Amino acid sequence: LEQQKEGILEARKEPLKLGMLALMAGNPDSAAEFFKPFLAEEAEPQIRNNLMMALANSYLAQGFAEQAASYYGTVIGLPEKGRHYPLALFSLGKAFELLGEIQKRDVVWRELEVNFSEHPLTFQAQLSQK
């Protein structure tokens, strides 16, 4: 039984490894395919949130603001507001900015300011708005 359990764990690691390689190679679409089982609602929340942030960051870095906004929005909408929440708010604002949606950016950054008034990303957002 223990060997069987180890085999299952090893099999689950493979798509994670391949997905991370795809991310490092600059291919978030391929990474998202490998990550599908880990992005499901019933997946372990910390892994799911980390992978969604990694995908969102990769999309944003490559200028795919719409895809990035989708992942950031999902992270923000999750019931468990973890350590990614301030970065997701800030980055969603950046994605909206790239899309030319300045009013949406300002709404998201206002939420960042209200909930995390002393966070460094709040100060960065305030500077970006000037």
Where are these regions (language model features)?
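Acidic, proline-/serine-/threonine-rich low-complexity intrinsically disordered segments
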Residues: 1-25, 32-34
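Short solvent-exposed coil/turn linkers within tandem alpha-helical repeat scaffolds
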Residues: 6-8, 39-47, 76-84, 113-125
